[in-house]
C-alpha cells in the first residue's frame, strides 16, 4: 500500500511522580537507552518526515539528553490532557500528511505494528491501536455499533455497562493532518478530569461519517506504559527475554537466557558461546566461535574469530583480532587494540595501547599510550608511566622484546627490537636493539643478620 508522507508526535511532557526521581520519566532507561529514545528510533525507522516532541517537565534535561536527534521541540507548559498536548503540536501539521501519535513512556512499540497501523488507516479516517484485556480497569473503552468503532469512553466517565467492555484504547492512533487539526479545534474539557482528551476525536470522526479501523499489536508489551520503576523493570525483562530468544534462534549459545542483558546491538558469527551475567552495550561485533565467560561487560567493541574472554573482564571501545585471549579480571579501555593471537591475563589494564601479534601480558600490568610489537613478553607488575601530571607520553616497544617483572617504563621512551629489560628496572632512556637494560641497585648481603626483636 502506498502511504502518504507522515510525521510523528511523541508525548513526553509528564513528570512521572511515581518514579520518585528528579529525572523526567521518559529519560529513565530500558536496555541502556532512554525510553523516549526507543520511541524516537521507531519513528525514524518508520520514515517520519518530522518528529515533534511535546515536552514540559524537565525540558532542559530532555534537550541535553536528546540533542543529537533532529527533533521539533513543542512546549506544553500546562499538562491539560493528551488532546491539549496535540493542540500544541497542531500548528506544525501539514494538511496532506498523516500524523501518528506515540508516547515517550511506551518504549516497546514495534515498527512492524506501527506499519500495519499506517497501512490500515482508511482514506479520510483514523487508524486506532487497541487491545483486549481481561481486566481493563482504568483504561478508556472502545465503543462499537454493529462492529464499527464509534468512540472511546475514559474509565472515569464510563457507565457500568461500558466498563464491561474489554477492548481498550492504547492511545496510539494515526489520522490525516488537516482532519486532525479540525478535530483538535473542537475538543472540550467537559469531563470528570477537566482535561482535553485526544480520544474525543474518535467520536467526532464517527459523527462525520469517517471510518475508524482498529488494529491490534503483535504483543501486549508493545503498548504497555511505564508509570513506576516496577513497571519499568518488568518491561526490561520482557525486552531482554525477546532479545535472548532472537539470539538463541540465530545460533548464539546463551548458557542462561534469563541472565543475559543486551543494551545495544549485537552482530555475531557462528558458534558463539556466552556464559551467565554477561552485559553487551552499544554496538558490539563478535566473530565466529567467540567464547565469553561469566560476568563480562563488552561495550562498543569488535571481537575477532576464535577469541576467548575469561570471566569478569571489561572490554570497552576496543578491537581484538582473531584468536586473542583475555582475562579473567582484565580491563580493556578505549583505544585498546590486540593483534592476532595476543594474550592479556588477569588484572591487566590497557588504554590507548596496541599489543602485537602473539605478544603476552600475563598479569598485574598497566599499559597506557603504548605501542607494543609482535612476540613481546611483558612480565608481571610492568607499568608504562605515561603521565607527568599535565601531559601524556607514549611508550614504544619493538618486536621480540622481553620485559621482566616489576618494570617501569617512564615515557616518552622506546625499547628496540629484541631488547631485554631486567626485572625491577626503571627505564628512563631509550633502549637499543638486542640490548640488556638493568637499573637495579646492586644486591648486598650481611651474613648472620638478626632482625630486631620486640622487648617484652
Swiss-Prot record:
Residues 251-456 are annotated as: N-acetyltransferase. In the N-terminal section; belongs to the N-acetylglucosamine-1-phosphate uridyltransferase family. Pfam families: Hexapep, NTP_transf_3. This is Bifunctional protein GlmU. GO terms for biological process: cell morphogenesis; cell wall organization; lipid A biosynthetic process; peptidoglycan biosynthetic process; regulation of cell shape; UDP-N-acetylglucosamine biosynthetic process. It comes from the Bacteria. PROSITE patterns: HEXAPEP_TRANSFERASES (PS00101). The keyword NAD does not apply. It comes from Shigella sonnei (strain Ss046). One of its GO terms (molecular function) is glucosamine-1-phosphate N-acetyltransferase activity. Catalyzes the last two sequential reactions in the de novo biosynthetic pathway for UDP-N-acetylglucosamine (UDP-GlcNAc). The C-terminal domain catalyzes the transfer of acetyl group from acetyl coenzyme A to glucosamine-1-phosphate (GlcN-1-P) to produce N-acetylglucosamine-1-phosphate (GlcNAc-1-P), which is converted into UDP-GlcNAc by the transfer of uridine 5-monophosphate (from uridine 5-triphosphate), a reaction catalyzed by the N-terminal domain. The gene is glmU. UDP-N-acetyl-alpha-D-glucosamine binds at residues 11-14, 25, 76, 81-82, 103-105, 140, 154, 169, 227, 333, 351, 366, 377. The keyword Magnesium applies. Keywords: Acyltransferase, Cell shape, Cell wall biogenesis/degradation, Cytoplasm, Magnesium, Metal-binding, Multifunctional enzyme, Nucleotidyltransferase, Peptidoglycan synthesis, Repeat, Transferase. Residues 230-250 are annotated as: Linker. Its EC number is 2.7.7.23, 2.3.1.157. GO terms for cellular component: cytoplasm; membrane. It catalyses: alpha-D-glucosamine 1-phosphate + acetyl-CoA = N-acetyl-alpha-D-glucosamine 1-phosphate + CoA + H(+); N-acetyl-alpha-D-glucosamine 1-phosphate + UTP + H(+) = UDP-N-acetyl-alpha-D-glucosamine + diphosphate.
Amino acid at each position: 500500500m502506498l502511504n502518504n508522507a507522515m510525521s510523528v508526535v511523541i508525548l513526553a511532557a509528564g513528570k512521572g511522580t511515581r518514579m520518585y526521581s528528579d529525572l523526567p520519566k521518559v529519560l529513565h532507561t530500558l536496555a541502556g537507552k532512554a525510553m523516549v529514545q526507543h520511541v524516537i528510533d521507531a519513528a525514524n525507522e518508520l520514515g517520519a518526515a518530522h518528529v515533534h516532541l511535546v515536552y514540559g517537565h524537565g525540558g532542559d534535561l530532555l534537550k541535553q539528553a536528546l540533542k543529537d536527534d533532529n527533533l521539533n521541540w513543542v512546549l506544553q507548559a500546562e499538562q491539560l490532557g493528551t488532546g491539549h498536548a496535540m493542540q500544541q503540536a497542531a500548528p506544525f501539521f501539514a494538511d496532506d500528511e498523516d500524523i501518528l501519535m506515540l508516547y515517550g513512556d511506551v518504549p516497546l512499540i514495534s515498527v512492524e505494528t506501527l506499519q500495519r497501523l499506517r497501512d490500515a488507516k482508511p482514506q479520510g479516517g483514523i487508524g486506532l491501536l487497541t487491545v483486549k484485556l481481561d481486566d481493563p480497569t482504568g483504561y478508556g473503552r472502545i465503543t462499537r455499533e454493529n462492529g464499527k468503532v464509534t468512540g472511546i469512553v475514559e474509565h472515569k466517565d464510563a457507565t457500568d455497562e461500558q466498563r464491561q467492555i474489554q477492548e481498550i484504547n492504547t492511545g496510539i492512533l494515526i489520522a490525516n493532518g488537516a482532519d486532525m487539526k479540525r478535530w483538535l479545534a473542537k475538543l472540550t474539557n467537559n469531563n470528570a478530569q477537566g482535561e482535553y482528551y485526544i480520544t474525543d476525536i474518535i467520536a467526532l470522526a464517527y459523527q462525520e461519517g469517517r471510518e475508524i479501523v482498529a488494529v491490534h499489536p503483535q504483543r501486549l508489551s508493545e503498548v504497555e506504559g511505564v508509570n513506576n520503576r516496577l513497571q519499568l523493570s518488568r518491561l526490561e525483562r520482557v525486552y531482554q527475554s525477546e532479545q535472548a530468544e532472537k539470539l538463541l534462534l540465530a545460533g548464539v549459545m546463551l548458557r542462561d537466557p534469563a541472565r543475559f542483558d543486551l543494551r545495544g546491538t549485537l552482530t555475531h558469527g557462528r558458534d558463539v558461546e556466552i556464559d551467565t551475567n554477561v552485559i553487551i552495550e552499544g554496538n558490539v561485533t563478535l566473530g565466529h566461535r567467540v567464547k565469553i565467560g561469566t560476568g563480562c561487560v563488552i561495550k562498543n567493541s569488535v571481537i575477532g574469530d576464535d577469541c576467548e574472554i575469561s570471566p569478569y573482564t571489561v572490554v570497552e571501545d576496543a578491537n581484538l583480532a582473531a584468536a586473542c585471549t583475555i582475562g579473567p579480571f582484565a580491563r580493556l579501555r578505549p583505544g585498546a587494540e590486540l593483534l592476532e593471537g595476543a594474550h592479556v591475563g588477569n588484572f591487566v589494564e590497557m588504554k590507548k595501547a596496541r599489543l602485537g601479534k602473539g605478544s603476552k601480558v600475563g598479569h598485574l600490568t598497566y599499559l597506557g599510550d603504548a605501542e607494543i610489537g609482535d612476540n613481546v613478553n611483558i612480565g608481571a607488575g610492568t607499568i608504562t608511566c605515561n603521565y607527568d601530571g599535565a601531559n601524556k607520553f607514549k611508550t614504544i616497544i619493538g618486536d621480540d622484546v622481553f620485559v621482566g617483572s616489576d618494570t617501569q617504563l617512564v615515557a616518552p621512551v622506546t625499547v628496540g627490537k629484541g631488547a631485554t629489560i631486567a626485572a625491577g628496572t626503571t627505564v628512563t632512556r631509550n633502549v637499543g636493539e638486542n640490548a640488556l637494560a638493568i637499573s637495579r641497585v646492586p644486591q648486598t648481603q650481611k651474613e648472620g643478620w638478626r632482625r630486631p626483636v620486640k622487648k617484652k
